[in-house]
Amino acid sequence: MTTGLLQGKRGIITGIANNMSISWAIAQLARKHGAELCFTYQSEILEKRVKPLAEEVGCNFVSELDVTNPESITNLFAEVKEKWGTFDFLLHGMAFSDRNELKGRYIDTSLGNFNNSLHISCYSLVELAREAEKLMNDGGSIVTLSYYGAEKVIPNYNVMGVAKAALEASVRYLANDMGENNIRVNAISAGPIKTLSGSVIGDFNSMLRSHAATAPLKRNTLQQDVAGAAVYLFSQLASGVTGEIHYVDCGYNVMGSNKIVG
């Protein structure tokens, strides 16, 4: 491993579901840049996927994290404090909504799924940031993952668009709250990527085709594109950057209209 932008830094990586996850690509690049990592998993099923990936990059700190359970959050940070004392960066990479409601009309969203989607996809950032602040004694960086559906209507994205809008607003408010402790909070708004979570969105393949045809770079966003931006935001190169929504979408967000692809 060569010396890199994150040499001597420690970070928590959440949101890995498999080897196609954006969080996994970020973890791989962070390790290449010298970071020591803690991987989290949400359930026993995901533990079986996450642990081999952690081993692949020489990470032996793997811990359970269920953001719907306050005790689980407390336990994670207690373990981080015991093993590391302090740490430097956090990736908030989780999002969830009932796949049956990621199609059709937003107006048909159920109360239960609305609350669950906002809790897991947005409020979890607030909870993790609150605990992280206690252990980021020398400042730090928190990065979360968003999508263009936070600001424009994307067919079938529905309640996730509302959750991502709340997430982006939370980034700005958290950046203000935590700035006095030199903790930076930013979001990466990535283009659509073939991941486990992306695949549950109705007509996702059409979304990919339209994105590639419309974006100035004429391609879809890759996990590695997002990973590079995340490592930059974790590093001292971004020491003056906070409260930002950083687009990594091959330029899609600057376009005024979509190209229709059959």
Curated annotation (Swiss-Prot):
Substrate binds at S97. Pathway: Lipid metabolism; fatty acid biosynthesis. Pfam families: adh_short_C2. InterPro entries: Enoyl-ACP_Rdtase_NADH, NAD(P)-bd_dom_sf, SDR_fam. The active site is at Y147, Y157. GO terms for molecular function: enoyl-[acyl-carrier-protein] reductase (NADH) activity; identical protein binding. CDD domains: ENR_SDR. Homotetramer. This is Enoyl-[acyl-carrier-protein] reductase [NADH] FabI. It comes from Rickettsia bellii (strain RML369-C). The lineage of its organism: Bacteria, Pseudomonadati, Pseudomonadota, Alphaproteobacteria, Rickettsiales. The gene is fabI.
